[in-house]
């Protein structure tokens, strides 16, 4: 791509806008609009920048994987996989083989596999949380994962085995933090 590409999830229209950024003028130009067929919100980019993942927050809850055209940033639907709930946040681990997701209304975290071609699969691990799970990220080094619960006022900490795709609660799992 000869210029930066910006991806915007449009929840109300159920679309993803692909925009090209002209850095010298500071303007955006529409490249493509892609139907996501539902309330699309959180998005995450694969570490190699070849796949864009987008979570649909209406039923049936799912994650969509779009292949990114290296020439112009256009998206092509690659795959879709179910999610256990409506997810407020998604992220990938450092290897790009695992999708982390957090459900604000479902009070849970989920771990889903991603195959070598970037296609996600159904969640292999679902972890109940306190109220309003909000985000989930791997730490640098990909050995630990941290998640937040807004309603519980905690940061949750897990050991992460990327080879087998397992999250193990650390002791203590929940670290209390101040509200706000």
Over which residues does each language-model region extend?
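Short loop/turn segments immediately following beta-strands, especially the blade-tip
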Residues: 19-26, 66-73, 112-119, 158-167
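Asp-box/WD-like beta-propeller blade repeats and closely related beta-sheet repeat scaffolds
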Residues: 74-140
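Short loop/turn positions that demarcate and connect the beta-strands within blades
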Residues: 37, 84, 130-131, 176-180
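Residue-level detector of Asp-centered blade-edge/turn motifs that repeat once per structural unit
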Residues: 1-2, 47-49, 92-96, 140-142
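A short beta-strand motif characteristic of beta-propeller blades
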Residues: 29-35, 76-81, 122-127, 168-176
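Structural signal for beta-propeller blades
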Residues: 15-16, 60-63, 107-109, 153-155
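Short loop/turn segments immediately following the C-termini of beta-strands
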Residues: 11, 57, 104, 114, ...
